[in-house]
Amino acid sequence: MLSLIEKLKQVKDFRKDKGKRHPLWIVLEVIILGTMLGYSGYRELGEFAKNNRHRLSKEFNIIPERVPSYSTIRRVMMGVDWQSLLKMFNEWALEEYGQRDDINWLGIDGKSLKNTLKNPNNEQQNFIMFVSLFSQESGLVLHIKRIENKKGSEIDECQAIIEDCTLQNKVFTGDALHCQKKTISLIAKSKNDYVITVKGNQKNLYQRIQDLSNSSKPESCFLEQDNSHGRKISRKIEVFKVRKDERQGFENLRRVIKVERKGSRGDKTYEETAYYISSLTESAQVFAKIIRGHWKIENQLHWVKDVIFEEDKSEISDFQAASNWSIL
């Protein structure tokens, strides 16, 4: 917590000194603490500060009657520069967690903020999205980028995260949107590896790996069953070697992974086949774990923000305030 406070002190304060009761970092810390305890919205956080004023006054050495109010919290959330807050978070997360032993498989994915949607029914539609770099093993977010829909794309921000990332010898995982030659080239340049989904957005590659998996013998195979959460799923994972002349411009492509899934939930059954490309040369069992782990970014990050913190239901629709809220 002390390292976070030191970083919060570096966030630029937009307020004038006259009439200012609290340093910006104290207001931000109160917002973080309240959010962690399930308070959302300006008024709820104002109530949190009021109800816990004696504890907060002791921790932050402020007068109990002068803990940050609803109006102060609202003003700060709408006024603090999201770029300064974002820079602070990214520096803090990498310094605090970047050297941990359980930071190896890094999922990358975007999440839109539904509460910021403007003009949903015409060409002027706009909203805020955040792209996160998420550790599968630890459940920690290591880097985030913010996009305004009309001014950027998830692909561009994903590539920017890879360029900014100073970690090496890690494995980036991503969905088919990020099966881009430039993205994969940047991963290779950063001295990291990848496991990326392939779908029809890369038609030639998709057809080639289908042909490869149908005409070649897998070098590794793994079968697994999953009977949890009221569903039954069987998975068959096969790994195929890729020659250098078969890479089609995807740098360091060494293996194709084919995953066949068969399952049922209640009375409904389904079958599907998915394909992945990778620079790794692991066994089918290891690839199975990495591929399953990628979806933790959905159920351990995006789900938590939506269901626990009710991000999409938030009444905060102002782009600046909503961006700051999502970062914190």
Regions found by a protein language model. Name each.
Residues L24, G293-L328:
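Basic, amphipathic alpha-helical segments enriched in Lys/Arg and hydrophobic/aromatic residues
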Residues I196-G293:
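An anionic, glycine-rich sequence signature occurring as long contiguous blocks
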Residues M88-E91, I103, C221-E224, L301-V307:
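Short coil/turn segments at secondary-structure boundaries
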Residues V30, D109, Y194, E298, ...:
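A residue-level signal for conserved active-site and pocket-lining positions in enzyme catalytic cores
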Residues L2-L4, D17-G174, C179-K182:
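Conserved, well-structured functional cores that handle cations and Mg-NTP chemistry
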Residues Q125-M129, K181-K199:
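A short alpha/beta connector and helix-capping loop motif
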